[in-house]
Design a protein with these regions (language model features):
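HKD-type phospholipase D/PLD-like phosphodiesterase module
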Residues: 34-69, 75-220, 234-325
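Ser/Thr-rich, Pro/Gly/Ala-heavy low-complexity intrinsically disordered linkers and tails
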Residues: 1-38
């Protein structure tokens, strides 16, 4: 399988350690792997493409769906944009093997679920293994995986700040496909084949996200930027404060919500500059440490990191990571 290059050993610690922090995951919270596993950070066969929402997001998603030729798998927490549902139906009608997994508890999915089922698109509710199926990703033709913080809802297409990536690396795609296949089987009452995530680049809840994201923050040597809807998990909060204490240049942008009053006070008291999001709604879950970015669906809460189905990944290639860093700089300048 994949192994760490020497350069990347210095970037992050191996993820085989036992979970630590304010509270560990429940015993049944890791159905798809025994533990965090190794960091599968050998160089990708090709650098991923990164993108930022909302500008051009619906057009990008439309193009990706329309480009599917053989298979299209979609797992989405919230799906309300009927125009994208229409493109999925069109893909099915032109012979693409389409499957869609939706969170069963979000009432916002009802209209699109009915539309897809009515058009004979195979559609299942996510399994009850998780508190929420909060992941947002696509697998296209077994050749590309789209991993992101965006839902397929109207606000994501028009007014939310989000980040995503498209990876065509075979290992990334295979791991994402395995996660989908497991949840598809479990959602249909079939015996799921556990996804083999013993060595993966992906950040997956419930099995490795808490450890990996905390370790990633701890790996920061000179610079750490955070742009998040909220930060509620104690281990993540502590790791950010500790980064500041060891001399890392830390900046944080938070959504302007009362939910963030406590963490804003904590960070400010420890000398961390914190700004409220500008003209957009901040739905992102972004970390950038020393030029390496994390993008994905994981909010920084104990439920998201240990009990939900979530999916994210690291972008350690300079060119696509720079796209994300530049957007953070723009948002920092526009926030207050």
């Amino acid at each position: 399988m994949r192994y760490l290059s020497l350069a990347l050993i210095a970037l992050v610690a191996c993820g085989g350690a036992t979970n630590t922090g304010d509270d560990g995951p429940p015993a049944d919270a890791a159905p798809d792997a025994p533990g965090p596993g190794c960091w599968g950070l050998s160089p990708r066969t090709a650098a991923p493409e990164t993108f930022v929402g909302p500008t051009g997001l619906q057009q990008r998603m439309t193009s990706l769906i329309d480009g599917a030729q053989q298979t299209l798998d979609v797992q989405m927490y919230l799906f309300t944009v009927t125009a994208l549902a229409d493109r999925i139906i069109a893909a099915k009608n032109r012979g693409v093997a389409v499957r869609v997994i939706l969170d069963p508890d979000h009432a916002g999915n009802d209209t699109v679920r009915t539309k897809l089922v009515g058009a004979s698109v195979p559609t299942r509710n996510a399994p009850t293994l998780y508190s929420f199926s909060h992941a947002k990703y696509l697998v296209i033709d077994g050749k590309a995986a789209v991993i992101m913080s965006m839902n397929f809802n109207v606000d994501a297409m028009s007014s939310e700040r989000n980040y995503g990536m498209i990876t065509r690396d075979p290992d990334d795609v295979a791991d994402t496909q395995a996660i989908f296949d497991m949840d598809w089987a479990a959602g249909g009452g079939e015996a799921p084949k556990p996804a083999d995530l013993a060595c993966t680049r992906l950040v997956v809840s419930p099995n490795n996200a808490k450890q990996r994201l905390t370790d990633f923050i701890k790996s920061a040597k000179t610079k750490l930027d955070v742009e998040a809807m909220y930060i509620a998990e104690d281990g993540v909060r502590a790791a950010i404060v500790d980064a500041k204490k060891r001399g890392v240049d830390v900046r944080v942008i938070l959504e302007t919500s009362s939910d963030n009053t406590e963490v804003r006070t904590l960070f400010t008291a420890n000398g961390i500059p914190v700004k409220g999001a500008g003209s957009f709604y901040l739905h992102a879950k972004l970390l950038v440490a020393d030029g390496v970015a994390f993008v994905g669906s994981e909010n920084f809460s104990i439920t998201a990191l240990t009990k939900n189905r979530e999916l994210g990944a690291f972008v350690f290639e300079p060119t696509p990571a720079a796209v994300i860093q530049q957007q953070f700089e723009t948002d920092w300048a526009a926030s207050n």
